[in-house]
Design a protein with these regions (language model features):
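Short amphipathic recognition helices of helix-turn-helix/homeodomain-type DNA-binding modules
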Residues: 1-4, 8, 49-107
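A short, Lys/Arg-rich alpha-helix, primarily the initiator
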Residues: 1-22, 27-28
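Hydrophobic protein-protein interaction segments
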Residues: 118-473
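Charge-biased C-terminal accessory regions appended to nucleic-acid-, cytoskeletal NTPase
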Residues: 459-512
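DNA-recognition alpha helix
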Residues: 24-30, 58-62
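Extended, compositionally biased accessory segments flanking or bridging domains
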Residues: 93-136
Length: 512
């Protein structure tokens, strides 16, 4: 969990680290009075004045500080300008879309061993020991929403997932000062089958238990292979530091009560319960068709969305896919017909609705699609699209970008990778994240993070327009030019393929 300091505090820390005095800095910067820098250190100056000071500081003493120290000062300055809550939310959303990654410091756990001696271990190794020899682990989490912790939690669970039954219930406070960074912090675990998260709304939570939900705590109840059971609670003391306490059965009364609250709170992801894969996929696409209808949509994704593939291209390929799976035409045709109707409705909605659609794509991923005919989330039973089909798909995007005033297409700059998967905001309805490579295979317990909290939706929309579109993407004109270049590559591949086919025919005639 990374610390956020005001500019005055950050500057004082940097001066202490570099053993520079305020007097020395004032002299080197030729400031009229030492009082000016003392006012900055006391936090009595505006962000604008602090910005001018920092630029002058860098100009005259740039070599005195490390890159990390300059970065910390700039972050502190930005936080002062926009406020701590908005800054933390913005940084969290930058992490969500893959445009920013803070260094993660390993967490540690302090505990008493069997002899009562104080011990210290890394958070990751402590969990690995906890899971070793376990048959079943039930975990109850309150707060602790941090990317570093959750990456380590994922790393601890992954090796034992096949032999240990793990269930994690996580209660997350949904206050506006925490909700955005909290939901980003849990992303490493949100698509894991064992993980179940709930948003705790103060209005729907018993007041006597609300304080409990806001603590930083992880409780693990372990059933061991020898038949014994044990429970340990980790309490977050401060930055990246837990203390561990062994709990008795009597201590678990609050845990049992909070589990009863699960029905009060909204889960933050979709879970596709499978009865039949094909019919469930129809329900899945129907839900998206309904969510897209009449909504402004803000996409970030690697390449062409499934729903933007023209029906005349997609459904011959779908039929081929079902046939290759061994299904008869009589078996698959009802599903194909139902999917075709929904897909056409989605295409029509995209082209005709008078609400804006923004889509930011990754150029390298689009180039890969042109080369291979395969999307990052290619439907798992489909063959790759041919060069001709690829051109037809891109032609739809070009036509929309040229002629539809409500359709806005961008290519991301390098600082926005767009390779982690899809992040899609359906304005006022939901913010959905999905990892690349799922193939929409619902048999694999397909999951997507689905956030409906109004504050998060508003914060993400503002972030998308003010940061993603304004600062992290090429202009629409530049992006359209790049898209048209990809179309020309498809045309070249088609011509080269035709020449190759003509050459093969000539060889056959010569052989005769």
């Amino acid at each position: 969990m990374n610390e956020h300091l005001a500019f005055a505090q950050c500057l004082q820390r940097v001066l202490n680290e570099t053993e520079l005095t305020a007097t020395e800095v004032a002299r080197r910067l030729e400031m009229r009075s030492r009082n000016s820098i003392f006012r900055i250190l006391k936090g009595k100056t505006s962000p604008q004045l602090n910005r001018r000071f920092l630029e002058n500081f860098h100009k005259h003493m740039g070599e005195q500080l490390t890159e990390a120290q300059w970065a910390a000062l700039n972050r502190a300055l930005e936080m002062d300008a926009v406020g701590a809550v908005e800054y933390k939310s913005r940084q969290a959303l930058m992490q969500l879309v893959g445009a920013f990654s803070e260094p993660i410091s390993p967490a540690k756990v302090c505990y008493l061993d069997a002899l009562g001696a104080e011990k210290e271990d890394s958070f990751l190794h402590y969990l690995q020991v906890l899971f070793c020899g376990a048959l079943k682990v039930n975990a109850l989490l309150f707060g602790c929403c941090d990317l570093g912790l959750f990456r380590q939690l994922q790393e601890a669970i992954h090796p034992v997932a096949q032999r240990v039954i793990v269930r994690i219930d996580h209660f997350i406070y949904a206050g506006e000062d925490e909700i955005v960074s909290n939901l980003v912090g849990i992303q490493p675990m949100v698509d894991q089958p064992c993980y179940h998260a709930y948003l705790v709304d103060a209005e729907n939570c018993p007041q006597e238990r609300l304080a409990h939900y806001r603590t930083g705590q992880m409780t693990f109840h372990v059933m061991h292979q020898d038949g014994s059971e044990s429970t340990v609670a980790l309490f977050l003391l401060g930055k990246n530091e837990f203390t561990a306490t062994v709990m008795s059965t009597q201590d678990l009364w609050m845990s049992r009560k909070v589990l009863c609250d699960r029905e009060r709170f909204s889960p933050i992801r979709l879970l596709w319960q499978l009865n039949d894969e094909n019919s469930d996929f129809i329900v899945y696409t129907q839900q998206y068709c309904k969510m897209e209808h009449g909504a402004a949509i803000y996409y970030i994704r690697p390449d062409v969305p499934f729903q933007y593939i023209p029906l005349e291209v997609l459904y011959p390929v779908v039929r081929e896919g079902f046939a290759r799976m061994g299904m008869t035409r009589e078996a698959y045709e009802p599903n194909v017909t139902a999917l075709a109707e929904i897909h056409q409705a989605r295409m029509t909605n995209m082209m005709r609705r008078r609400r804006p659609t923004y889509i930011v794509l990754n150029k390298a991923a689009m180039e890969e699609f042109v080369r291979t005919g395969r999307q990052s989330d290619h439907l798992h039973f489909l063959r790759n699209f041919t060069p001709k089909e690829r051109k037809q798909i891109l032609d739809v995007l070009v036509q929309q970008a040229r002629k539809n005033p409500f359709f806005h297409l961008y290519f991301a700059q390098e600082k926005l990778p767009c390779t982690m998967g899809e992040v899609a905001l359906y304005d006022g309805r939901a913010l959905i994240t999905m990892s690349s490579g799922s193939g929409y295979d619902l048999r694999t317990d397909h999951r997507e993070s689905c956030i409906t909290h109004p504050f998060v939706l508003r914060a993400y929309k503002q972030f998308y327009m003010n940061t993603v579109v304004a600062r992290l993407a090429d202009t629409q004109t530049e992006s359209l030019n790049q898209l048209e270049e990809l179309v020309r590559r498809c045309e070249k591949m088609i011509r080269e393929g035709q020449k190759g086919n003509a050459g093969n025919e000539q060889e056959k005639l010569s052989g005769q």
